[in-house]
Amino acid sequence: MIISSSNDYREAAKRRLPPFLFHYIDGGAYAEYTLKRNVEDLSQIALRQRVLNDMSSLSLETKLFNETLSMPVALSPVGLTGMYARRGEVQAAVAADKKGIPFTMSTVSVCPIEEVTPAIKRPMWFQLYVLRDRGFMKNALERAKAAGCSTLVFTVDMPVPGARYRDAHSGMSGPNAAMRRYLQSMMHPQWAWDVGLLGRPHDLGNISKYLGKTTGLEDYISWLGSNFDPSISWKDLEWIREFWDGPMVIKGILDPEDAKDAVRFGADGIVVSNHGGRQLDGVMSSARAMPAIAEAVKGDLTILADSGIRNGLDVVRMLALGADSVMLGRAFIYALAAQGGQGVSNLLDLIDKEMRVAMTLTGAKTIADINESCLVEMNKLIQS
């Protein structure tokens, strides 16, 4: 098929992947209302077209946490990335490195930290959950620091797993899940050969290193399910600071009061995020949450955003709402599943081009120029 947009990568990924993997990344929590709103709310934001502004010196370059980025985009942490392409974390990290943006490794990656960092030149970011097993958390932080990871992305909107009904239907969970996954894999021979066979081991690299034994998909479901910690509080983040002295970003903020708490705690940044609609269905989209959060803490820390961002226009929209940078999750996984690391590179180049078109026709010569003035009737479209 011809691929010319991020939506095309989604369709290509759907063709290539066994259903349990496609629906795991494509789906959300409960009835998936928030998942839909994330995309719809962004798409409804009207950009304000301005012309004849001499845009010949346009630049997408920006700085985050003392790092220079070629554009204000980072790849989000996505669990099981290595199941979407052979050693997928390595391929995605290399693509991000070539583009000059950060790759964020998930706690529950297939490839361990130590496999990914030697493949790239720029430091990657590392994502961590609050888990009951504090020994694992300490071990993961020490290994991330030893591997040269520069920024910690601390996910706080997952004290309990979200209810993802689609997973039970697809075979990721539910009755006879292992058998259903096996049969689906056999019906997708290209994936089964390239990833299912040649992409082994399919264990949870970071967790296996700690436990000292091989882990698999069932361990992913059971170990995480029993280790998420609903007692999480700001005091837990104080404990993290004992083991991490680099930039810390709090991921999963949707309320201005929580954003203010992050400032008081001393966080270097936040990610305005509803976990891609995968946790609590019915909460507002990141786009709707952004203006109030930006008004409350803009300038006090770095504001990133994810959830619903699919293309370069969405990046510009989110920046205009108040974000300093964005993170891509599903979009890069679709590209990775469809064409491996080259697909991720192509997607990032596409987003780059889309941003340049949007900036040229809104009169924003630099990332700093992208603000509320680039939007039409923002209050009516976003805050109503």
Curated annotation (Swiss-Prot):
The keyword ATP-binding does not apply. It catalyses: (S)-lactate + A = pyruvate + AH2. It is a peripheral membrane protein. It is found in: Cell inner membrane. PANTHER family: L-LACTATE DEHYDROGENASE, S -2-HYDROXY-ACID OXIDASE-RELATED. NCBIfam families: L_lactate_LldD, PRK11197.1. Its cofactor is FMN. The active site is at H275. It comes from Acinetobacter baylyi (strain ATCC 33305 / BD413 / ADP1). It comes from the Bacteria. Its EC number is 1.1.-.-. Residues 1-380 form the FMN hydroxy acid dehydrogenase domain. Belongs to the FMN-dependent alpha-hydroxy acid dehydrogenase family. One of its GO terms (molecular function) is FMN binding. One of its GO terms (biological process) is aerobic respiration. It is an enzyme of class 1 (oxidoreductase). GO terms for cellular component: plasma membrane. This is L-lactate dehydrogenase. Substrate binds at Y24, Y129, R164, R278. The keyword Oxidoreductase applies. Keywords: Cell inner membrane, Cell membrane, Flavoprotein, FMN, Membrane, Oxidoreductase. Catalyzes the conversion of L-lactate to pyruvate. Is coupled to the respiratory chain. FMN binds at residues 106, 127, 155, 251, 306-330. InterPro entries: Aldolase_TIM, Alpha-hydoxy_acid_DH_FMN, FMN-dep_DH, FMN_HAD, FMN_hydac_DH_AS, LldD.
